[in-house]
Each structure stands twice: as structure tokens, then as C-alpha cells.
Amino acid sequence: MALDPVRLEIFKSLYSSVAEEMGITLRRSAFSPNIKERRDYSCAVFNKGGSLIAQGDHMPVHLGSMPMSVQAALQIADPGPGDVIVLNDPYAGGTHLPDVTMVAGVYPEAQARPQPSAARRKRPLFYVANRAHHSDIGGATPGSMGLAEDIYQEGLRIPPVRLMVGGIVNTDLMRLISANVRLPAEREGDLTAQLGAIATGRVRLARRRR
């Protein structure tokens, strides 16, 4: 079956606009100049298999490796409805530790709220993800960008874990992150902005499926 170039361009613009709007939410909600002014962030949309299908006009270094972080999140944490996975692990598709990634599934409206375990195993329609450069993630040097002999000196390394479970923020994990970084209030603000960008992506994709 031949591809219709008109339909292809329509769908490309449709899904790319979701990633762009996620980026707008993130930039306007963030606390740190790294995100608000330097615009050191990226947002993207993935299909139900975790393959990249659309991205915003953001940071190539983020977008090139983000699919590996999404695959790691799906394999290790398997986000269900209302879940958001956070990670910054370079061994799971991350870039450097200050770049924090969030991944979440977009489910049909009937499954958008937390469901019993059988429903949680159903595949989502899409995944949405964003990555943002935090101005500090702990470690020996302010800004987490100093010379280091191993990754443990660089800062807090976060494997794929749930920052939001069934629509509820995991406050224990948020406190753990805040206790290991400089300017914890700013870090919490930027993480919350990333959660807001995820919510924007979910809402926009759900509306486009109606």
C-alpha cells in the first residue's frame, strides 16, 4: 500500500504539535534558568512499542538517546495508567546525570485512572517523554559538571523508578532526590514542571484519539 504524502504530513504535524506543546508547558512552568531561558529540554511522542514517532524542535543530543531511556523504562518499570517513570542513568539511555528524563503511557480514557492489575497490563496507545537539564543533581561539584573519576562522584544516579504512581506523586522518592541535591526547592519545581509536561502530552493525545 502506497503512502499518502498528504496524510503523512498531517499526522506528522499532529503529533509533533503535541511534543511542542509539552515543551511550552515545561518551559513556562520550570523554576531554573537552564530550562526557562537556555531551553535545555526536549519532548517527544512514542508509539505503543516505544519507538519514536514525533519530536519537538528541541535538543538533538537529548532526542537521539531518549528512545533508549524509554525502552529501559518499559523493560524495568512498565508504567501503568497514571504512572510516570523518572530516570537519569547514563547506562539506561541517559546523557549525563543532570539530564533527567520522564516517561509515561497514554491509555484509553476508560483506563486513564488507576485500574486493577489485569487492566494495567493492557498496552497504552502511546508513550510521552521529556528530558530536562537540571542545574544540580548532587555530587562533588556544584552544577554536577565537574571532573570526576567515576559516576558516583558526578551526582545522584536514578534508575527507572516511579515518581508518580496511579496519579499520585511518590513523595518519598521526591524527598530522597531533594535531600541529595543543591537548591532542593528548585529541583522539586523543575521535576513538577516535567510532570506537568507529561500531563499536557497525555491530555492532547487523548483528545486527538476521539
Language-model features, listed with the residues they occupy:
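A short, polar/charged loop-to-alpha-helix boundary motif
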Residues: 61-73, 135-144
